[in-house]
Curated annotation (Swiss-Prot):
The entry's keywords: Ribonucleoprotein, Ribosomal protein, RNA-binding, rRNA-binding
GO cellular component: cytosolic small ribosomal subunit
Keyword Ribosomal protein: yes
Region (Disordered): 217-242
NCBIfam families named in the record: rpsC_bact
HAMAP family per record: Ribosomal_uS3_B (MF_01309_B)
Family matches, as PROSITE patterns: KH_TYPE_2, RIBOSOMAL_S3
Domain KH type-2 span(s) in chain numbering: 39-110
Protein name in UniProt: Small ribosomal subunit protein uS3
GO BP terms in the entry: translation
Membership in a protein family: Belongs to the universal ribosomal protein uS3 family.
Length: 242
């Protein structure tokens, strides 16, 4: 009998990168891993309105680097960068080390509706507002298709529309090749808290296939070409340097 494997874990080192990039001894590894978890929980809880899709953490000696991928960078940066300093102080307080150097880099998400986590968050918000789940899924599919994704799958499970018996409903549009390792699959989960209980949301988005050693993403059926020079807008914090 077949079982579904986590799409991100299956592709680590192929089309996906690790969200925590550091090395540690066997004694320090669990401590630093728990630190990463606390940092992510703190950021998602306090800055939920900023539409943060991913938090990448890297460690170099005594320096901690945090990269935030967000749909609304202005909410994080704040006026004249005041939000960055507040975020840095909050991270230092979370890990219990105010002397640790924390460097923060905010990256704007190019296509919001093509991001699996942000799409799952949108679905959760609509379900919590008591919008019918089928209408919510249909609207989410339309938004993703307008963003130019090649395929997506959405699954919602729980007491849908307040039904007595929990069930799972899903829909798929386009191609979602979960067995193809070179396929770039963006996967995310989210929980919606409703008056009838919690609903589990899963989103798979197929963005293209990665070709060659340069990890170049190419839509299926298109001729290979290099990406343009345009880069997503970045807000890099260098106040701790020098």
């Amino acid at each position: 009998m077949g079982h579904k494997i986590h799409p991100t874990g299956l592709r680590l080192g192929i089309t996906q990168e690790h969200r925590s990039r550091w090395y540690a001894t066997s004694k320090m590894y669990p401590i630093l891993l728990q630190e990463d978890d606390r940092i992510r929980r703190f950021i998602h809880k306090k800055y939920g309105a900023a539409g943060i899709s991913d938090v990448l953490i890297a460690r170099k000696a005594d320096q901690l680097e945090v990269e935030l991928k967000t749909a609304r960078p202005g909410v994080l940066v704040g006026r004249q960068g005041s939000g960055i300093e507040e975020l840095r102080t909050g991270i230092q307080k979370t890990i219990g080390d105010h002397s640790r150097q924390v460097r923060i880099n905010v990256v704007e998400v190019e296509r919001v509706d093509a991001d699996a986590f942000l799409l799952a968050e949108y679905i959760a918000q609509q379900l919590e507002k008591r919008v019918a789940f089928r209408r919510t899924i249909r609207m989410a599919v339309q938004r993703a298709q307008r963003a130019g994704v090649l395929g997506l799958k959405i699954q919602v499970g729980g007491r849908l529309n307040g039904a007595e018996i929990a069930r799972t409903e899903w829909t798929r549009e386009g191609r979602v090749p979960l067995h193809t390792l070179r396929a770039e699959i963006d996967y995310a989960t989210k929980v919606a808290s409703t008056t009838y209980g919690v609903l589990g949301i899963k989103v798979w988005i197929f963005k293209g296939e990665v070709l060659g050693d340069e990890a170049q993403t190419m839509p299926v059926g298109a001729s290979p070409r290099r990406r343009g020079n345009r880069r997503p807008q970045q807000f890099e914090d260098r106040s701790n340097e020098g």
